[in-house]
Amino acid sequence: MKPGASSRRTIREAGATPQAPIQFEFDAGAGRHRVWGTAFVSQEGLAVNLVGGDVPHIGAVAISIPRPSRADARRRSATTSVFALPGHKEDELARPFAASLAQALGRTTVVVAGVHIRRAGPADIAKVFENAGRAVEAIIARLKAPPRDRDWRVAVDGFAVSVVRTPSRRGRKRS
């Protein structure tokens, strides 16, 4: 190697081909308590947009980075930071959602959350959290599935994830 040259090789130089990004949609629940969104998976991590209720919006953003647990290095934990817009409480949804995904998948995870239900009571909030939990389970199941099974729908307790693959650049005609 020449002096000053980097010893790091790109994926293509190492002879590997990068995994194509995957994008899919999810939803859980019904009516006012329904949550839905999209997940975008790349080699660098996972980005999830989670919205729902009467007024879908951006209320909070969480980023979670997986790391070894301080209590038991054989287990995975996550460090999570959250930014909530003034007057919004979606940080309570975005933080555990991002942390659960990062811990289970070992990927840096960003979650943008915005769920608003007009005149919501404690039961409404509990139902939204339950549906978000189902969404987490389905996303984890989808991404832990063997590659050959990823083109199939994944059902978790009657909850389905629809898969939409990001188009490959190969085979496209240039205009």
Segments (PLM) and residue ranges:
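Short, Lys/Arg-rich amphipathic alpha-helical interaction segments
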Residues: 141-157
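Short Lys/Arg-rich cationic patches that frequently serve as NLS/NoLS or arginine-rich RNA/DNA-binding motifs
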Residues: 2-8, 165-175
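Conserved mixed alpha/beta catalytic, RNA-binding, or beta-rich assembly cores of soluble enzyme
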Residues: 25-104, 108-117, 122-146, 163-171
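Charged interaction patches that mediate protein-protein contacts
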Residues: 1, 156-165
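Short, Gly/Pro- and small/polar-rich lid/capping loops
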Residues: 2-31
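Intrinsically disordered, low-complexity terminal tails and inter-domain linkers enriched
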Residues: 8-10, 14-15, 152-153, 159, ...
